[in-house]
Swiss-Prot record:
One of its GO terms (biological process) is ergosterol biosynthetic process. It comes from Gibberella zeae (strain ATCC MYA-4620 / CBS 123657 / FGSC 9075 / NRRL 31084 / PH-1) (Wheat head blight fungus). This is Acetyl-CoA acetyltransferase ERG10, cytosolic. Keywords: Acyltransferase, Cytoplasm, Lipid biosynthesis, Lipid metabolism, Metal-binding, Potassium, Steroid biosynthesis, Steroid metabolism, Sterol biosynthesis, Sterol metabolism, Transferase. K(+) binds at residues 186, 246-247, 347.
Length: 396
């Protein structure tokens, strides 16, 4: 990227991650996205009218209404002139949104872009297929939108967990290794939470109703839920003889995350303080059923695009769609576990599909600041066979 104009991250913000039907389930994807965008804009020290464009991820858009990104932008108080585009690259949606935002600034189309993503899996509806033709005779079956559009391979019609089991077989991962990884993810997330290290979080206020005071949600729901004995005793979730279980996989969640991106000219003009500089990115695709290890292709592409070597990357955030995903990609890339997901990952924190790519960017900026490190990389797989990755430089 030596010949391309630099792009800076000047703020990060994410909501706490709510459990399925948990603390944030009363809030729509739009409401959560609006909170994240508003928080990011306020932290950046810019005015709402300074924002040129919004790229925002959302996967489970049924019932959300037209243009989720546009709704989130206006809900956050951005002006009606702001351009907004919704991105659906499954789990990588919000990281791809950040990549698109950076590219937009590099092309000179915009100077200030808000990018990220949102998801309320709790509010995803069930579908009644073919009802438009009339229910002529017999039962009508409801289709779960979370499964249909979020967690099922479109080609083989298998649950994502079947792909995780294939990953386990391909890379000789044991049940014990997956369980131990999940336990460590929870413990790291618990330690980071208690130490106040998730500085990217902005609280969500839930109206109390009937004269009751509003409830302020400030912590991730799932982090506290570790039960080691129960985790180790859990039955396989996807195959009778499998090793992937509910607790060694990411849960179903609600949440949103956003970053503010600016050009160098606007950074200087408005005297903004950069959080990080985007150094490079990469996307990759492979067989749909092996999407789990696509980050091992995308991350090296991002590092090469940044003009760096793997040895220069100090910390990684690899999205834990399953414990097996993190284990396999670390194995392929030869990474030291002490470098990866040091505040825990999505197994413990949660995985709202359209939010997670941006969530791991916000967490990485917190890690790099606290550890006084310079270079970090993120990678996230997505259903269909893909992954996206990004490399950033800490400027805090």
């Amino acid at each position: 990227m030596a010949n391309l104009p630099p792009v800076y991250i000047v703020s990060t913000a994410r909501t706490p991650i709510g459990s399925f039907l948990g603390s944030l389930s009363s809030q729509t994807a739009v409401q959560l996205g609006s909170v994240a965008i508003k928080g990011a804009v306020e932290r950046a020290g810019i005015k709402p009218e300074d924002v040129d464009e919004v790229f925002f991820g959302n996967v489970l858009s049924a019932g959300v209404g037209q243009g989720p990104a546009r709704q989130c932008a206006l809900g956050a108080g951005l002006p009606q002139t702001v351009i907004a585009t919704t991105v659906n690259k499954v789990c990588a949606s919000s990281l791809k949104a950040i990549i698109l935002g950076a590219q937009n600034i590099m092309l000179g189309t915009s100077d200030i872009v808000v990018a990220g993503g949102t998801e309320s899996m709790s509010n995803t509806p069930h579908y009644l297929p073919n009802l438009r033709n009339g229910a002529k005779y017999g039962d009508q079956t409801l289709v779960d939108g979370v499964l249909k559009d979020g967690l099922t391979d479109s080609f083989k019609k298998d649950h994502m967990g079947i792909s995780a089991e294939l990953c386990v077989d391909d890379h000789d991962l044991t049940r014990e290794a997956q369980d131990e990884y999940a336990i460590n993810s929870y413990k790291k997330a618990q330690a980071a939470t208690e130490a106040g290290l998730f500085t990217e979080i902005v609280p969500v206020e839930i109206p109390g109703g009937r004269g009751k005071p509003a409830i302020k949600v400030e912590r991730d729901d799932e982090v506290k839920n570790l039960n080691v004995d129960k985790l180790k005793a859990m039955r396989p979730a996807f195959k009778p003889d499998g090793t992937v279980t509910a607790p060694n996989a990411a849960p179903i969640n609600d949440g949103a995350a956003a970053v503010v991106l600016v050009s160098e000219a606007k950074l200087k003009e408005l005297n903004l303080k950069p959080v990080a500089k985007i150094l490079g990115w990469g996307d990759a695709e492979r067989e749909p059923e092996r999407f789990t290890i696509a980050p091992a292709l995308a991350i090296p592409k991002a590092i090469k695009h940044a003009g760096l070597t793997a040895e220069q990357v100090e910390y990684y955030e690899i999205n834990e769609a399953f414990s097996a995903v993190a284990l396999a990609n670390m194995k392929i890339l030869g990474l030291n576990p002490d470098q990866v997901n040091v505040y825990g990952g999505s197994v413990a924190i949660g995985h709202p599909l359209g939010c997670s790519g941006a969530r791991i960017v916000t967490t990485l900026t917190s890690v790099l600041k606290e550890r006084k490190a310079k270079i970090g990389a993120v990678g996230i797989c997505n259903g269909g066979g893909g992954a996206s990755a990004m490399v950033i430089e800490n400027l805090q």
